[in-house]
Design a protein with these regions (language model features):
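Extracellular calcium-associated, cysteine-rich motifs in secreted modular proteins
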Residues: 1-205
Length: 205
């Protein structure tokens, strides 16, 4: 029995007297929240109340208050407001809980400047939304692996090559694998004796 409470308008077992123990945070709304305030609507049943107009998910000091993810019973705190909760054992935990981010592929809730889903720290092309991977680790000037993106690396698994300017099947870097000694001439690619003239007798030069 609670001597400091005597009325319970909404019938949720939390009293209306705001100065008493276990005061109902929402005295006219039946609720089952117990974590941040008593007796308010808690849709997902995790103990933290759904946010309301006068009770937001973050306090003025930046601490979690109402449920930042009111439809997920495994998450409730989302201090940076990016939609990913801070409980590491819950659904889709925030990998960067102190920064508001939109990444969702390699990590959840981290900065993703180009909006491609990959976090900036893991994206070799953080300002190009069409590229995010460089498997062979060659120069970023060679471009990314996505063949439909900007400036693609035509040989994404060969760190010695990335272009075939003349389209003859031999690659621009003459010192790399399958190199082209004449990168701007599709009729020539080899110059075994190094005299500046191509070996293909049917080609130019």
């Amino acid at each position: 029995m609670n001597n400091y409470q005597w009325e319970d308008t909404d019938g949720d077992w939390y009293g209306d007297n705001q100065l008493g123990d276990d005061a109902d945070g929402c005295p006219t709304v039946y609720g089952n929240s117990t974590g941040d305030r008593f007796g308010c609507l808690d849709t997902d049943g995790d103990g933290y109340s759904d946010p309301t107009a006068n009770w937001g998910i973050i306090t003025p000091n930046g601490y979690c208050q109402a449920d930042g993810l009111p439809l997920d019973p495994t998450q409730w705190c989302d201090a940076d407001g990016d939609g990913y909760g801070e409980n590491p054992d819950g659904n889709q935990p925030d990998d960067c809980p102190d920064e508001k981010g939109s990444s969702f592929i390699d990590r959840n809730g981290c900065l993703d400047s180009d909006g491609d889903g990959y976090s900036d720290s893991a994206d070799p092309f953080p300002n190009d939304g069409t590229q995010w991977e460089n498997r062979d680790g060659d120069s970023l000037d060679c471009g990314g692996d996505n063949q439909t993106g900007n400036n693609p690396d035509l040989f994404p698994d060969d760190p010695t090559q990335c272009r075939d300017t003349d389209g003859d099947g031999y690659v621009d870097n003459s010192e790399g694998n399958n190199g082209d000694a004449f990168k701007n001439d599709p009729t020539q690619w080899s110059d075994i004796d190094g005299d500046g003239y191509g070996d293909n007798l049917a080609g130019v030069l």
